[in-house]
């Protein structure tokens, strides 16, 4: 009996030793809190550096000198055999306030697409105009259809006396002092056509001298 008890005690001791060794191995394999913190900080630091490197190669955002303004936005429909087709029509004016101005009209199924097309059309129809001390050289009347727009020069400090579609053209063109008045129909597209017609019809003293075959001093 004594030998059997001794053997049993020895077996229990071996099992206890094996369990302790197994627990120690698991404890060694388990990552420590310091190791986890180092790994996380290293990962975050590496990602931050990569982001900085990516920012170096990113191209700076291009900012256009032209300003866009939506003058008219409306929904239109076309009746066909299959039903009504709904679209959007947009009238846009673009200018750099330094003597370049243009306008465009476009249609599309969605508003963003119509705006993009109208802006592109406006950039393709840019005009270079003359500005004399923030105003125009002389009084002029622009015409388009049933619309007539009167443009008159104004002294400095007067400001822009205009409204609606006429004001969009005058402001984005770069004028600061001018009188305007609508003498006909107030359809936005016709008012813009008439305003541009009047602006482009003005003659500077140099152009008048060239047309009359005279010097500036003789005028």
From Swiss-Prot:
Superkingdom of source: Bacteria
UniProt feature coiled coil, ranges: none
GO BP term, pick one: translation
Cystine crosslinks: none
Any one Gene Ontology cellular component term annotated for this protein: small ribosomal subunit
Molecular function via GO: rRNA binding; structural constituent of ribosome
Keyword set, alphabetical order: Ribonucleoprotein, Ribosomal protein, RNA-binding, rRNA-binding
Positions of the S5 DRBM domain: 66-129
Region listing for Disordered, in residue ranges: 1-61
Residue ranges with Basic and acidic residues bias: 35-47
Keyword tRNA processing annotated: no
Cross-referenced Pfam families: Ribosomal_S5 (PF00333), Ribosomal_S5_C (PF03719)
Biased composition regions of type Polar residues, renumbered to the chain: 1-21
Summary of the function given for this chain in its UniProt record: With S4 and S12 plays an important role in translational accuracy.
Family of this protein: Belongs to the universal ribosomal protein uS5 family.
This protein's domain notes: The N-terminal domain interacts with the head of the 30S subunit; the C-terminal domain interacts with the body and contacts protein S4. The interaction surface between S4 and S5 is involved in control of translational fidelity.
Oligomer status and interactors: Part of the 30S ribosomal subunit. Contacts proteins S4 and S8.
Protein name: Small ribosomal subunit protein uS5
Natural source organism: Mycoplasma pneumoniae (strain ATCC 29342 / M129 / Subtype 1) (Mycoplasmoides pneumoniae)
Native organism taxonomy: Bacteria, Bacillati, Mycoplasmatota, Mycoplasmoidales, Mycoplasmoidaceae
